[in-house]
UniProtKB/Swiss-Prot annotation:
The gene is gpsA. It comes from Staphylococcus epidermidis (strain ATCC 35984 / DSM 28319 / BCRC 17069 / CCUG 31568 / BM 3577 / RP62A). The keyword Hydrolase does not apply. It is found in: Cytoplasm. It is an enzyme of class 1 (oxidoreductase). Belongs to the NAD-dependent glycerol-3-phosphate dehydrogenase family. It catalyses: sn-glycerol 3-phosphate + NAD(+) = dihydroxyacetone phosphate + NADH + H(+); sn-glycerol 3-phosphate + NADP(+) = dihydroxyacetone phosphate + NADPH + H(+). Sn-glycerol 3-phosphate binds at residues 106, 137, 139, 192, 245, 255-257. One of its GO terms (cellular component) is cytosol. GO terms for biological process: carbohydrate metabolic process; glycerol-3-phosphate biosynthetic process; glycerol-3-phosphate catabolic process; glycerophospholipid metabolic process; phospholipid biosynthetic process. This is Glycerol-3-phosphate dehydrogenase [NAD(P)+]. Its EC number is 1.1.1.94. Keywords: Cytoplasm, Lipid biosynthesis, Lipid metabolism, NAD, NADP, Nucleotide-binding, Oxidoreductase, Phospholipid biosynthesis, Phospholipid metabolism. InterPro entries: 6-PGluconate_DH-like_C_sf, 6PGD_dom2, G3P_DH_NAD-dep, G3P_DH_NAD-dep_C, G3P_DH_NAD-dep_N, NAD(P)-bd_dom_sf.
Length: 332
């Protein structure tokens, strides 16, 4: 039995906290919303994110960052990408020893184009950094929390950290594979959100299976091109952290990114869609990062470019689809 602090009280952090508690670990969650914390401590629920799920009664929550930091030596960073750097810096100020950091964020930082493990590494001083890893793959929180069979990948530059993640989370409904390609696993998780928004647009516009299959296939090609340029193993994108995550995010109404795209395809603006959803949609920020990163690296990413125009330049979705279909002739 290990003590683990979960930073963030969103849907996935809550679902994974439940997994850890059911695996016999002592779990403390940290969040900023007092009502969420009180609800979890009193009723063992987090209705804002997993409205019908009854959580393990051993899970506790706090708004006290220092209490959360001192509670354990293993930190699960279940925060949106844009919050990772700030919270990591705040944590570092309170540390007196090395900690292991496991993140589940799927994004790329806007200004630096850094992956989440790099953001944590930047923010945590070397004397406090006991290793950084990621848990990623096709894993909707709504299914994990009700013990639907789920399979994910754990990755780190340190194989001992990958194995620790595997040992902490694996049980009879959550299977965890280790993967030594940290770059590929992180990029696969982040970049698929772009394609998921585009997939939702296609569905929202009423296009059929042919268009959806084409989008996912060509989307995977984009992900692989950029990933390989950034040092990832192309084979990673054929695994759980790549095509596995891509399929589940591009085909499910559980996916926030797909849902946003669907609303865009129906004619709503991004602002209108987000107002309805009231949730963080990582793919928006990732689209912005990857659009500029691809230009910097000289990597062709037409789907990403088209989505960037829709989200940030107010180009109609119908025009973007037409632009993609009318591109110059090419070999596959």
């Amino acid at each position: 039995m290990r003590k683990i602090t979960v930073f963030g009280m969103g849907s996935f952090g809550t679902a994974l906290a439940n997994v850890l508690a059911q695996n016999g670990h002592d779990v403390l969650m940290w969040g900023k919303n007092v009502e969420n914390v009180d609800e979890l401590n009193t009723h063992h629920m987090n209705k804002n994110y997993l409205k019908d799920a009854k959580l393990d009664s051993s899970i506790k929550a706090t708004v006290d960052l220092n209490k959360a930091v001192q509670f354990s030596d293993i930190y699960l960073m279940a925060l949106p990408t844009k919050a990772i750097r700030e919270v990591s810096k705040d944590i570092d100020q309170l540390l007196t020893s090395k900690k292991t950091f496991i993140h589940v964020a799927k994004g790329i930082e806007n200004d630096t184009f850094k992956r989440v493990s790099e953001m944590i590494e930047d923010s945590i001083s070397s004397e406090h950094n006991g290793g950084i890893g990621v848990l990623s793959g096709p894993s909707h929180a709504e299914e994990v929390v009700i013990k639907q069979p789920t399979t994910v990948a754990a990755s780190s530059k340190d194989n001992n950290v990958s194995k620790l993640i595997q040992d902490l989370f694996m049980n009879d409904y959550l299977r965890v594979y280790t993967n030594n390609d940290l770059v590929g696993v992180e990029l696969g998780g982040a970049l698929k959100n772009i394609i998921a928004i585009a997939s939702g647009i296609v569905a929202g516009m009423g296009y059929g299976d042919n268009a959806k299959a084409a989008l996912m296939t060509r989307g995977l090609a984009e992900i692989s091109r950029l990933g390989e340029k950034l040092g990832a193993d192309p084979m990673t994108f054929l695994g759980l952290g790549g095509i596995g995550d891509l399929i589940v995010t591009c085909t499910s109404t559980h996916s926030r990114n797909y849902t946003l795209g669907f609303k865009l395809g129906q004619g709503k603006t991004a602002e209108e869609a987000l107002k309805e959803m009231k949730m963080v949609v990582e793919g928006i920020y990732t689209t912005k990062s990857v659009y500029h990163l691809a230009q910097q690296e000289g990597v062709e990413m037409p789907i990403t470019n088209a989505l960037y125009e829709v989200l940030f330049e107010d180009v109609p979705v119908s025009k973007s689809v037409r632009t993609l279909m009318e591109r110059d002739k090419k070999a596959e």
